[in-house]
Regions:
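Thiamine diphosphate
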Residues: 1-135
Length: 137
């Protein structure tokens, strides 16, 4: 069997893996993770199946907090679930992250690490967003 190689950026690589390994994907666009959600939505629209032969349900929410709430609800219903976020969006998910961890419910949160803007918009990469929520479990 001949290997097939493709060149993709980090967002597309994450979207491909997330789409193949989840049943529900809750999204809300925030730079630089927007492309992950857009690609996952595109894959489901095209009818691409995950590893279990099911087309994942992609739900665009009204906010990052809504996306985190949708993840929590889907996890409680027994679905393999994920979302994509970064920066201030991740900070808005912190209350739900505590709830999810406190209920010992595992899931994978895909974070495109970005500076948390303190006084003006910042698109620079660092880990201040991830470090702000590392204690959530």
């Amino acid at each position: 069997m001949r290997e097939r190689w493709i060149t993709v950026d980090g967002n597309e690589a994450v979207a491909r893996v997330a789409h193949r390994t989840n049943e529900v994907i809750a999204i809300y666009p925030i730079t630089p993770s927007s492309a992950m959600g857009e690609l996952a939505d595109e894959y489901s629209t095209q009818g691409r199946q995950n590893l279990w032969g099911v087309v994942p349900t992609v739900v665009e929410m009204q906010s990052e907090g809504g996306a985190a709430g949708a993840v929590h609800g889907a996890l409680q219903a027994g679905s393999l679930t994920t979302t994509f976020t970064s920066s201030q969006g991740l900070l808005l998910m912190i209350p739900n992250l505590y709830k999810i961890a406190g209920e010992l419910t595992p899931f994978c949160l895909h974070v495109a690490a970005r500076t948390v803007a303190t006084h003006a918009l910042s698109i620079f990469g660092d880990h201040s967003d991830v470090m702000a929520c590392r204690q959530t479990g």
